[in-house]
Amino acid sequence: MNGKYPQKRAGNPAYFGLKLSGNYRLPSLPQAYMATGHNSAFISSDDKRYIVYHTRFENRGETHEPRAHQYLINEEGWPCMLPYATGGETASKSGYDKSSIVGEYYVVNQGNKIDKSIAEPEKWVFTEDGFVFGQGMDGTWEAKDGTYYVHIKTALPSEDGTVDAADSYSGVFCKMKDEAGTDVMTFSAVGNNESIWGVKYNGK
C-alpha cells in the first residue's frame, strides 16, 4: 500500500494520502481518541459506506476498542468521515434547513502530521448570511441547494496584519447522534490535505 497517491492539496503524486482521522477530542467523548488505525472500509447492502478501525485512548496505554464511522462522498468525490461512531444515521440527500445548520460548532482539524499531538476542538460560528468565524479565523460557508454538500473557505490573519490566502474545504452535513446519544448536526469536510469535523450543540 505504499504511495504514490494523488493529493487533495494538488494533483501531484505523493507518498501519503488524505488523512481522515488521527488523535482528536470532541464533546461527548470521555477521553481523546488516539491512534485510530488498522482501517477497513466497506459498502453495506443499503449502499452506506463505513470505515471500521480500532482506537486507543488518552492515558489508557495499549487499551483499544473498535469503532465504525459512516463516511460520505463530497461533491468532488473525496471521502468525508463523520465525526461520531455510527448510530444508524441516514444523511438527508436533499440537504437541511438553514435554521438547523447555523449556530456554534466545535471543530477539530485532523491536520496532516503523524505524531502524538491531539486535535483539540475550537469554536466556529456559522451565520445565517453565509459567514463563519472562530478563534483568529474568519471565512464563508455555502450549502448547495437540494444536497447535503457544503463548501467552506477560511483565512487566518498573518503576523503583519494581512490575511493569508483562504483554505477551501468541501464536505457534507449530516444529522446524527453523538456518543452520548444526543442528536447533533455535524459536518465533515476535506481540503488542503486536511480533514475537519464540526459538531453543533443545543441549537446555539
Placement of each model-derived feature along the sequence:
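Carbohydrate-active catalytic/glycan-binding domains of CAZyme proteins
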Residues: 1-204
